[in-house]
């Protein structure tokens, strides 16, 4: 069915003669067949959001509806891929039309010609329901792609075979309950605005290990959780997001560059293939899907990119994998919503954002979770969503930050004052929080011992005491404080500089596992306890601050992974001896 354009306003096109079209249908606009999506219908008039540049388009141009909603292709070949916001493969587009994307270019999202080795798991005669696994394809060295029955189908398998197939060839035939024979391929399509179904949602109870000490120890996120990384420009949001994408102990990472600089996506493409996953030893790119929707691409496609990314992530979650979606940045996505809302002449909300901003953000974050996947084998999968927020001027009272804070359960607030002091990650320990601490405590107690959470609480207490002591120090100076308070300031400095600070560009320090984090924090707190005992016996605080072991603790995080256990034990032993010697001398002086 086709209609005619009557108005063009930037990415918004108004067309008439589309009485039989539906909301969310994909349309092709004009002679160049630009991709668009119907936002609203009124009679036979449709407001269409066009995902490509509309210059040169005018009234009278033809609009053709496809009759299908905005969907993504799901199948083998997505891992290591780099897509734009509407799942067009950028590498294939370069091969077809060169470095500049021409308007209306059509390239299948998944390679339809490439052959994959399919190993059948199901057998003829098996009764299957949506989500059941038909077979597997070894997509990369680390990802075993499970080919599933589409979620809406059920029936009996009448034929299935292993072998070499492309994604459009029939691998099995399903006889449905109404007697129809349906051919099944390795390719599925799913509308991006609709969450993929699951059987049951569970409270998240396993932590996501990111290798970043301030995140894992102080403000942990659970697998299946939601987190926001708000911060002003230059505070290190993108580096935090890159660190999460590099080192998180998940099976698949979907990285959405939504409206950010092209250089940042280039960094990912340059670094990830060279970096090795500490758990598998393979290149990080072999578990990553990239969606690049940079700031110079059409604004409307930003709005689609987040939905595209999370739909791809849900597909891998349905296989029983732990998946992380990292969106950088949701503020740019909200700005795209604001622009389209303004063009539609809708009633603006706070700061010009549409009134439905909070509900759209919630739709994104609520698709995260730890779930029992559909299918008869009770697979468990998780989808963790992390979104960066870029509030203008670092003002966390603006609408996107406030709406995000109401939805997410982990808030890593980046602070420009810490970034200017070269303290990275610049996560402010006084304004950040994690609401998963209680639900993760049983896991920490079982795997790391109850002292891990106790040490975390002690360290947070020391940092809070430091903040209140700093006000006094500014008035009367450090020397006016008692020895105990001076020790609190010194230990807080050790926690900040020797534990929380982490160098993302230093191979040894970029990733730190839980056991190492526990030992390092335990060593700093042990220094605190031993020094307090020594001060009580009359030892000089200044002498205690200058022991050789104090400097060794400062260098402990740069010890190679294979040596750290022995080195940390040696530092602990040296520290105990050196403090005991000063304590004995302090007692003798009295």
Identify the role of each PLM range.
Residues 1-102:
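N-terminal accessory targeting/assembly segments
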Residues 18, 32, 68-69, 87, ...:
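Short, surface-exposed secondary-structure boundary micro-motifs
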Residues 36, 44-46, 68, 153-157, ...:
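Metallocofactor- and cofactor-centric catalytic cores in central/energy metabolism, strongly enriched
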Residues 95-150, 166-226, 240-243, 278-297, ...:
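P-loop NTPase nucleotide-binding/switch module
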Residues 217-218, 224-549:
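P-loop NTPase catalytic core
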Residues 535-590:
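C-terminal amphipathic alpha-helical interaction region
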Residues 11-16, 46-52, 112-123, 156-160, ...:
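Short alpha-helix capping/helix-loop boundary micro-motifs
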Residues 40-46, 76-87, 143-163, 182-196:
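Short, compositionally biased
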């Amino acid at each position: 069915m086709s209609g005619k354009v009557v108005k063009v306003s930037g990415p918004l096109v108004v067309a008439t003669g589309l009485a039989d079209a539906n909301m969310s249908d994909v349309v092709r606009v004009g002679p160049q067949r630009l991709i668009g999506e119907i936002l609203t219908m009124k009679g036979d008039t449709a407001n269409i959001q066009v995902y490509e540049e509309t210059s040169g388009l005018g009234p009278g141009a033809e609009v053709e509806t496809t009759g299908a909603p905005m969907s993504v292709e799901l199948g083998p070949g997505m891992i290591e891929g780099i897509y734009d916001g509407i799942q067009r493969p950028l590498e294939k587009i370069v091969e077809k039309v060169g470095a500049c994307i021409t308007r209306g270019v059509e390239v299948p999202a998944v390679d339809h010609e490439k052959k994959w080795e399919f190993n059948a798991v199901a057998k003829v005669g098996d009764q299957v329901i949506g989500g059941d696994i038909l077979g597997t394809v070894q997509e990369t060295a680390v990802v075993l792609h499970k080919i599933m029955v589409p979620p809406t189908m059920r029936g009996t398998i009448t034929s299935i075979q292993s072998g070499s197939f492309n994604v459009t060839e029939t691998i099995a035939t399903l006889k449905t309950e109404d007697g129809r024979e349906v051919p099944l391929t390795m390719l599925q399509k799913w509308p991006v605005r609709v969450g993929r179904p699951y059987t049951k949602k569970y409270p998240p109870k396993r932590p996501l290990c990111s290798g970043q000490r301030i995140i894992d120890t102080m403000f942990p996120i659970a697998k299946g959780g939601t987190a926001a990384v708000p911060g002003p420009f230059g505070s290190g949001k993108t580096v935090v997001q890159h660190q999460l994408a590099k080192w998180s102990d998940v099976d698949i990472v979907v990285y959405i560059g939504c409206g950010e600089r092209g250089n940042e996506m280039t960094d990912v493409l340059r670094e990830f293939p060279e970096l090795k996953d500490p758990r598998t030893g393979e290149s990080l790119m072999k578990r990553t899907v990239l969606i690049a929707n940079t700031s110079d691409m059409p604004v409307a496609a930003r709005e689609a990119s987040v939905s595209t990314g999370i739909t791809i992530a849900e597909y891998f979650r349905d296989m029983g994998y732990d998946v992380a979606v990292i969106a950088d940045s949701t503020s740019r996505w909200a700005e795209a919503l604001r622009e389209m809302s303004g063009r539609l002449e809708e009633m603006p909300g706070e700061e010009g954002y549409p009134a439905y901003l909070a509900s759209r953000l919630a739709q994104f974050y609520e698709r995260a979770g730890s779930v029992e996947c559909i299918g008869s084998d009770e697979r468990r999968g998780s989808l963790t969503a992390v979104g960066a927020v870029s509030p203008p001027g670092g003002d966390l009272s603006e609408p996107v930050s406030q709406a995000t804070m109401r939805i997410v359960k982990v808030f890593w607030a980046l602070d420009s004052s810490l970034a200017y002091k070269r303290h990275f990650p610049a996560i402010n320990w006084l304004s950040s929080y994690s609401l998963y601490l209680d639900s993760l405590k049983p896991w920490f107690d079982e795997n790391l011992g109850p002292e891990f959470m106790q040490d975390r609480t002690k360290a947070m207490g020391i940092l809070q005491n430091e903040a209140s002591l700093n006000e006094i120090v500014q008035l009367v100076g450090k020397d006016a404080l008692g020895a105990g308070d001076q020790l609190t300031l010194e230990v807080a400095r050790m926690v900040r500089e020797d534990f929380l600070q982490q160098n993302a560009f230093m191979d040894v320090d970029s990733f730190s596992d839980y056991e190492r984090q526990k030992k390092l924090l335990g060593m700093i707190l042990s220094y605190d306890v031993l020094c307090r005992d020594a001060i009580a016996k009359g030892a000089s605080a200044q002498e205690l601050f200058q022991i050789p072991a104090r400097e060794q603790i400062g260098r402990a995080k740069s010890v190679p992974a294979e040596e750290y256990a022995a080195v940390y034990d040696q530092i602990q032993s040296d520290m105990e001896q050196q403090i005991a010697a000063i304590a004995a001398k302090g007692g003798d002086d009295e």
